[in-house]
Design a protein with these regions (language model features):
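Basic, flexible Lys/Arg- and Gly-enriched helix-loop patches that mediate nucleic-acid binding at interfaces
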Residues: 2-248
């Protein structure tokens, strides 16, 4: 049995991300078999007891994750040139939506410290729908990190044009983009003008390129689900907290 970095053990235990673990080690908030770990890169056996002190656990519990229904014309990431408006600018108390349809409406205060709130994944400027922003490295890891390989992302895509049954089969499995063979997708007609796409990967403008290859023009693209979390009745431009009952 080999030793591994304590930061990796903490991440595997779901207590924090590796980056967060390193910060807690620097602050003296990590214990190994009851003793404070004071050196980055310290290794241990998985059979040893690795834990976070109360202050670190509290800090983790205070980290926010929000679901935003991003409108078209907003970018998902920060723009250093300030040429475009970032979606994070919509995370304001005025845009907060606490749906009464949720089993347990959030008790979190919509006025919260947004430091470190970053998008977990991207959504094109000309696409709308579900965008996750989080302060929690564990959530980011689930959506865009090592654990994201099996996370489904569902989209409603308004298209113009007609395709054959063989074209539809090609969209489901068989397309190569930029010399890369895409993973199988689930693509079905929602109605005569709209396709439903379910992907387990998210390459740059993937859906638009897939549609273009079979002669379809995309007139609108909206993400409605990531993993087990759905956009549901969240209005465009509004946001809510990820509830305690939800997990990706």
């Amino acid at each position: 049995m080999e030793q591994v970095r304590i930061s990796k053990i903490l991440s595997e235990l779901g207590l924090c991300s590796r980056r967060e673990a390193d910060k807690y080690i620097e602050q003296g908030l990590v214990l190994l078999d009851g003793k404070v770990v004071d050196e980055l890169g310290t290794k241990a056996y998985r059979s040893q007891k690795v834990e976070l002190l109360k202050k670190a656990r509290l800090n983790q519990s205070l980290k926010a994750t929000v679901i935003l229904n991003k409108p078209v014309s907003y970018i998902s990431h920060l723009d250093d040139d300030k040429e475009f408006t970032p979606a994070s600018s919509l995370i304001t108390p005025d845009n907060y939506y606490n749906s009464q349809n949720q089993e347990t409406p959030s008790k979190r205060n919509p006025i919260f410290n947004r430091d470190g709130l970053a998008p977990a994944g991207r959504l094109d400027i000309d696409s709308s729908g579900m965008l996750v922003l989080t302060q929690d490295g564990r959530i980011a890891k689930q959506i865009i990190g090592e654990e994201s390989a099996d996370i489904e992302k569902e989209y409603l895509v308004r298209v113009e044009g007609a395709i054959t049954d063989n074209d539809l089969k090609l969209l489901n499995h068989g397309i190569t983009l930029d010399d890369y063979e895409l993973k199988p997708a689930k693509v079905n007609w929602q109605n005569k003008d709209q396709l439903n796409f379910i992907l387990i990967e998210g390459r740059n403008r993937q859906i638009r390129k897939m549609c273009e290859l079979v002669g379809l023009r995309v007139n609108g693209l909206k993400r409605v689900r990531i993993g087990n979390v759905r956009l549901n009745d969240l209005p465009e431009g509004k946001w809510r907290f990820l509830s305690e009952e939800e997990s990706f």
